[in-house]
Amino acid sequence: LYVTALKHAGCQVAAKDHPQHIETMHLEPYQEKVRTWFEKVSLPETQAEEKPALEVLDLDFSYITGKPILSDIHFRINKGEMLAIVGKNGAGKSTLSNLICGFIHPDHGKILLNGSDIADKSIKERGEAIGLVMQNPNQMISKPMIFDEVALGLRVRGVPEEEVKERVYEKLKICGLYPFRNWPVSALSFGQKKRVTIASILVMNPEILILDEPTAGQ
């Protein structure tokens, strides 16, 4: 993705820039071209009455005072849109996810969900609308069987078992896991476990879906 973006910005990527991994690539020579391209690129216009599903306004955050991790972050995502955030390790991608979910709180700025400020919303209240798939599936999975893991959130909310079965099967098919529906999680590869966690969030039908390192193990 980052190499494609550089090419669209008119950058001539060379082998000496070490483009194999974004963590090792020399990006400094291209920053100005990318910034200019980003500012000029036109995005599809949305209807005036449409509210963004998620909007981040002038967001600042630091773990240590005076050492900002995120500064002046501003973006909006409309319903049905996808946004990829690419950066080196430690750039603040997971930190941004944690801010949106309410695990940590910004030093400055606002996060709006469907036009409403969610600063006073609890983690549980945000979780009703925002689904987060973490980088490491082993940090999410708590049930030994695949079906039970994907069904857990629905059962906790008291969804009837017939509906649970229907919704779980649907998401397992989407994630390519239906043939393994009665398997133990321990029999899966890391990448397959990642898909189990994606299915367990999709089954809850969140308004916003955040995938932290979505291609890990795939």
What feature does the model see in each segment?
Residues 205:
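Conserved catalytic motifs of ABC-family nucleotide-binding domains
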Residues 86-88:
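The feature captures the beta-strand-to-loop junction immediately N-terminal to the Walker
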Residues 184-188:
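Conserved ABC ATPase signature
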Residues 151, 155, 162-180:
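Conserved ABC ATPase "signature" region
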Residues 101:
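Helix-to-loop junction immediately C-terminal to a conserved catalytic motif
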Residues 109-117, 126:
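Conserved ABC transporter NBD signature motif
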Residues 209-212:
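Catalytic Walker B motif of ABC-type/P-loop ATPase nucleotide-binding domains
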